[in-house]
Amino acid sequence: MHQVPLAVLVASICLYVPAGATDTPNKVGSDELSQIVAAAQNMPDADLAQKFAAMELTDRLSGTRLADLTSRLPGDMSRRALMLIADQSIFLPPPADEIPLDAAPNAASVQQMLVNVVNYINATNRQLPNLMAMRFSNGFEDQPREDRMGRTGLESTFSLPLHWVGSLKVQVTYRDRQEMEDKSVKAEKKGNGVAGLITTGEFGPILSIVLADASKGKLAWTRWERGSGGTMAVFHYQVPEDKSNYHVKSCCILEGYNQDGTPRTQVSNVRSAYHGDIVFSPVDGSIRLLTMEAEAPAGALVSVASIAVEYAATDIGGRSYICPVRSVSMQRVHTTELSGGITGSSYKGPVKTFLNDVRFSNYRRFGTKTKVLTNLP
């Protein structure tokens, strides 16, 4: 489970199976990807999906550009394959042509931008109305080749690259500054649904926690970016472990067995240093993209724990609010053996990767029936 609660930022995962190796990817930039999509208008869905699966982006594909390219694709397989490579690029800098060469701001301007960001986050926490939205999650996992002891003897799994495993559509509410799943609306599940990684806190807590942590670490202006709302500023931050509220949890390490033969496990909980970018409007401080990447120590069970949240202007009840429209969560985790009497402290399995893509849409005020759609892919 991967959560962002109000008081402590937590990344965690529950698993009992392990990350497969893939062939060397074909590295392409966003512009080249756009050309590939334009040239593939008559390509079958499965063939185009396979073509995307062999690619790795070298720069960040913006949400706006992703939506445009997605609208041109022939089917679900190619859309999911594009989603996957785009999600993995969200932690990268944008293409060079989206980085203006304007002069760097002076110290006074940087300080004012920081004040704007602080004021924006404080205002968001106070002024965001009680609302409802649909949260649509797509889950991706890989599978390594592994031999392990099972109930009937040695069992082998075959290597698979990152692939779509399922989706989950639920209604969420944000009420009195608390985000929760609306159990009164039946969830819609496809495939195996979404397991392993679950995020919450995109509506405000994650912003407050990161800014509070970053203020105790290092925070500096790093570049300009060209966004859909004009020129954006970027702060890069680094948070040391002793100032961090980012805890990386991994479940489960085997401690031993109970008298009835069932495994007795514990959750590893490690406070982690982390870093990331805050992309925001220098005019009003509104956040457009937040990234977080844990700095795992050598030998850690969790080698990657990253979160990115993209925000955009959204109409709710006739007023415009900056709300989350997309989030990406990714973890790479060593599995631990739960059979054969080998403890997690003495055995680490191969690495398994989990990635979740989450989209928010159909925003409306709590208690109303009018649905306002956002322009999401």
Named regions from a protein language model:
Residues 1-2:
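N-terminal secretory signal peptides that target proteins for export/translocation
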Residues 15-16, 69, 375:
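Residues in and immediately flanking transmembrane alpha helices
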Residues 20-100:
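General marker for long, soluble alpha-helical cores
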Residues 91-275, 282-288, 293-307, 312-377:
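Structured extracytoplasmic
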Residues 15, 21, 166-170:
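N-terminal processing/targeting junctions
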Residues 29, 279-281:
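Helix N-cap / beta->alpha transition motif
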Residues 5-16:
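Bacterial N-terminal signal peptides
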